[in-house]
């Protein structure tokens, strides 16, 4: 019987494809945009619920307004971030 530890093991060539810089940057920006949307909308909902309970006699509209403000803020930050990334990519090319 042959001992499998004595035979040299050939290293497999790396087949992992590296993504282009622009695609990796875009993926990073989209991840940040989606996480911002989730966080800011949730914070807006939380503030809306608190104001609804404390000030507005448990009405629903402050919660919806809070979600809208959070989502709007996240959208603007995402838009700015993506435009800045596009400018940087164009400057490099």
From Swiss-Prot:
Biological processes, Gene Ontology terms: cristae formation
Segments passing through the bilayer: 34-56
Keyword GTP-binding on entry: no
Pfam families membership: DUF543
A Gene Ontology cellular-component term: mitochondrion
Topology, Mitochondrial intermembrane side: 57-93
InterPro entries: Mic10 (IPR007512)
Main location: mitochondrion
Membrane topology value: Single-pass membrane protein
Keyword annotations of the record: Membrane, Mitochondrion, Mitochondrion inner membrane, Transmembrane, Transmembrane helix
Subcellular location as annotated: Mitochondrion inner membrane
Functional summary from the UniProt entry: Component of the MICOS complex, a large protein complex of the mitochondrial inner membrane that plays crucial roles in the maintenance of crista junctions, inner membrane architecture, and formation of contact sites to the outer membrane.
Similarity annotation: Belongs to the MICOS complex subunit Mic10 family.
Subunit structure as annotated in this protein's UniProt entry: Component of the mitochondrial contact site and cristae organizing system (MICOS) complex.
Name the UniProt record assigns to this protein: MICOS complex subunit mic10
Organism, scientific name: Neurospora crassa (strain ATCC 24698 / 74-OR23-1A / CBS 708.71 / DSM 1257 / FGSC 987)
């Amino acid at each position: 019987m042959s001992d499998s530890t004595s035979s040299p093991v050939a290293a497999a060539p790396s087949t992992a494809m590296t993504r282009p810089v622009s695609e990796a940057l875009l993926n990073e920006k989209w991840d940040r945009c989606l996480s911002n949307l989730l966080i800011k909308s949730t914070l807006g909902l939380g503030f809306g619920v608190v104001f609804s309970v404390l000030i507005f006699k448990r009405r629903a509209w402050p919660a919806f307004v809070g979600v809208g403000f959070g989502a709007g803020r996240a959208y603007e930050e995402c838009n700015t971030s993506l435009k800045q990334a596009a400018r940087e990519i164009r400057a490099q090319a």
